[in-house]
């Protein structure tokens, strides 16, 4: 019975207040009307005093085509329909002028709250041209939006829209941080240099050379630094294995090899050596461990071209206190010639350096007698023949005799070229050794003409000295040519320009860059090795593993001491 509409109920419904289904405005009666007078100022714009009748229930949310769109007019307004249309146009113009060109609110919320369902036409929600949604946002069309343009609705309600340059500051487009704090992206290795640590930073093992302290990365970045208790050099290196600490001989046990491998793997890891075409044999390696003159100076051959004095100090000061070190640099190319020297304060530190560097493929030995000292030891102590250089080009034999008077000269000669032009060089044989020594003391560095260099007088080379000079010169030329061939691919593309200075750039050199540390190794290829194709020079087993039993047998110059002894 409740659903049956009786004439009485219908009468009550007609007399009760009615409600627009899409509006909150109540209508007192279906026929109630409100008059709105147009301002008299509009008359100057060509408008009459037309009265526009609007239904109070009309709302911007009324659907198109509803009965609320009808405008009730007074009888005299029917003939003034054109003026009513003009009034609507004026209203729209005022509304468009008040509309802000650039929205200050969220365009998504504006579009959701201002859908075009109103009675009067409205502008569509304005989307700034520089608005970019997040890359993970899902494109969803907003109903009755701008024709042909679909809106964007982020998948997460908490995401705020971005404008212009603000898009790049949004967290979703940030690059991945090495600490793995981003929740959407997968990690990747970032090609950066670690920060230079402070001098007193805890956890640093190499502290005996604070001036050239190597940078270490943060604990969150895996590197090739090895967690190893470095021996305290100030305490006499108590952690050195007995075979090295007591016998001072080549490490031939597994304990010694592992210990040396750990020293090699400390940051900065010592790079693989430039190989030699004619490496030393195992017998020569043993002889290189013997210091006949009890010297502490170590000769190291096989250094990469980018090795500087600072790099060499960083490589050698892990074995003990270094009193001096020098990498031999070519003055023309500013690159290392492939060898250098390191002088230690203690002989046992030099022994450890030779053993460890040999493990990396370097040719190391106690520095032999210098070239000048060796040459002097080969001279003839009974010779009276003098070698004279920087002679004036117009001088002849009589001029030399006149210069050395009253000393007696047995014979003299000025060297000339094929055109009989003087070379500025001559010889003079004196009467005895004492007279020759007096001539050297008196006329060596003697200035004949301020426009010419001073005279240089010394004893002429003996037969043994000439032979030694020839051998040394050939050896140096061969090694220089060999080293140039082996490093040609590295220097051709300027791969080894001048190494960055640690103090100026606060970053490690190319050799000291970081590479990920694998689980079962204590020594990794340096980035220099991987970048410049040194794999063609070394076999795959030239990386020295900590599990020594599983290492493969090697050729002599790659051999571990223990492997060579076993064979």
Swiss-Prot record:
- UniProt feature coiled coil, ranges: none
Domain of life the protein comes from: Eukaryota
This molecule's function is given as: RNA-binding protein which plays a role in sporulation. Regulates the progression of meiosis I and may function in the vicinity of the Mei2 dot.
The principal localisation class reads cytoplasm
Per UniProt, the ranges with Low complexity bias are 21-35
Give the CC-aspect GO terms.
Answer: cytoplasm; cytosol; nucleus; ribonucleoprotein complex
- GO molecular function, a single term: poly(A) binding
- The ranges of region (Disordered) come to 1-39, 52-76
Instruction: Tell me any Pfam family this protein matches.
Output: RRM_1
Q: Example GO biological process term?
A: ascospore-type prospore-specific spindle pole body remodeling
Q: Does the keyword Transferase apply?
A: no
Where is there biased composition of kind Polar residues? 1-18, 56-66
| RRM domain segment(s) | 296-380, 384-462
Q: Where in the cell is it found?
A: Cytoplasm
What name does UniProt use for this protein? Sporulation-specific protein 5
Keywords for this entry? Cytoplasm, Meiosis, Repeat, RNA-binding, Sporulation
